[in-house]
Amino acid sequence: MDLDQLDLNPRITAAVKRGRLKSVKEILCYSGPDLQRLTGLPSHDVQCLLRAASLHLRGSRVLSALHLFQQKESFPEQHQRLSLGCPVLDQFLGGGLPLEGITGLAGCSSAGKTQLALQLCLAVQFPRQYGGLEAGAVYICTEDAFPSKRLWQLIAQQRRLRTDAPEELIEKIRFSNHIFIEHAADVDTLLECVSKKVPILLSRGMARLVVVDSIAAPFRCEFHLQASAIRAKLLLSLGATLRRLSSTFRSPVLCINQVTDMVEDQQSVSRSLGASEERLSPALGITWANQLLMRLMVDRTHEDDVTTGLPRSPVRTLRVLFAPHLPLSSCCYTVSGEGIRGMPGTQSY
């Protein structure tokens, strides 16, 4: 940066140039006494020089976090999200999944975890103006076979689910051609997959979403209690690799997790009867929780109709357990042949 741009007495500027200092940043690399020796300026002139250089680099004023947030239109890449394919759920999650970081999705069986993951695998293929990233997805199965039948059902219903996108656009997307499926039944295979195979797809732009279904299965079946230290070390290694991939390629990572019952005393259990979801905790403990940017949890409960006494359709709820940009909140949703839809007016904060 040119020294003539500094608001200084010409005498000070000339002395700086005689000292062979060529930039403002170079000036700030020296202490006051060193600048005095290089330029021959007195102490008060050197202080004026340092102050002018600091003000020039700092800019006109200090920017607060609120100001940067309000300028998000000027930095669209930093605020981009991956849509879930449902406007209600997108609004609930502040636009969708963050592009950088690991999102954990935990919940009991039949709550809709895999359904949501499959819906994201389709949503990521849409153009950016429709919440997608115009790329495919990597789906890593660790316990069950890939649900291809359900995937084809969702593909066939995309025109009914994604009413925001033109039908011509949906017809052009070859959804099934851009979902890359891997099976990893043990920890070593999973680590090899995310460290060698997945980076190739991400670096070539063929995929921009990574799904692991589920993260807990290989760790829970391979390690006993005495091997908890080894398990923690491997979990940290896996988390670091997934975070690095997400940050390098700006691709969201969704890790589906199982749940375990929390151990409580008899008094606590008796108080929480009828609220079983409050006694469930995501598996793998604090070691894995520290790897996540955002943790979501889904649950599925049955309620009886007050008038008839017959069981109603199951009530499913998506909850935000922690996230740096979202409050603790919940939203109800339904699972149908078309996919997952949020229920308007059910958000609670």
From Swiss-Prot:
Using the record for this protein, list the coiled-coil segments as residue ranges, or answer none.
Answer: none
Out of the domains of life, which is the source?
Eukaryota
Q: Where in the cell is it found?
A: Nucleus; Cytoplasm; Cytoplasm, Perinuclear region; Mitochondrion matrix
Q: Is Magnesium a UniProt keyword of this protein?
A: no
Q: Which residues carry this modification: N-acetylmethionine?
A: M1
One GO biological process this protein is involved in is: telomere maintenance via recombination
Tell me which residues bind ATP. Answer: G107, C108, S109, S110, A111, G112, K113, T114
Acyltransferase: is it a keyword of this entry? no
Could you tell me which InterPro entries the record lists for this protein?
A: DNA_recomb/repair_Rad51_C, DNA_recomb/repair_RecA-like, P-loop_NTPase, RecA_ATP-bd, XRCC3-like_C
| Coarse class of the protein's main subcellular location | nucleus
Q: Name one GO molecular function term.
A: ATP binding
What are the alphabetically sorted keywords of the record? Acetylation, ATP-binding, Cytoplasm, DNA damage, DNA recombination, DNA repair, DNA-binding, Mitochondrion, Nucleotide-binding, Nucleus
Gene Ontology cellular component terms for the protein in this record: cytoplasm; cytosol; mitochondrial matrix; nucleoplasm; nucleus; perinuclear region of cytoplasm; Rad51C-XRCC3 complex; replication fork
Q: State whether it acts alone or in a complex, and with which partners, per the record.
A: Interacts with RAD51C and RAD51. Part of the CX3 complex consisting of RAD51C and XRCC3; the complex has a ring-like structure arranged into a flat disc around a central channel; CX3 can interact with RAD51 in vitro. Forms a complex with FANCD2, BRCA2 and phosphorylated FANCG. Interacts with SWSAP1 and ZSWIM7; involved in homologous recombination repair. Interacts directly with PALB2 which may serve as a scaffold for a HR complex containing PALB2, BRCA2, RAD51C, RAD51 and XRCC3.
Which purpose does this protein serve, as stated in its record? Involved in the homologous recombination repair (HRR) pathway of double-stranded DNA, thought to repair chromosomal fragmentation, translocations and deletions. Part of the RAD21 paralog protein complex CX3 which acts in the BRCA1-BRCA2-dependent HR pathway. Upon DNA damage, CX3 acts downstream of RAD51 recruitment; the complex binds predominantly to the intersection of the four duplex arms of the Holliday junction (HJ) and to junctions of replication forks.
Family recorded in the similarity comment = Belongs to the RecA family. RAD51 subfamily.
PANTHER family, alphabetized: DNA REPAIR PROTEIN XRCC3 (PTHR46487:SF1)
What this protein is called in its record is: DNA repair protein XRCC3
Source organism per UniProt: Mus musculus
**Gene name of the encoded protein:** Xrcc3
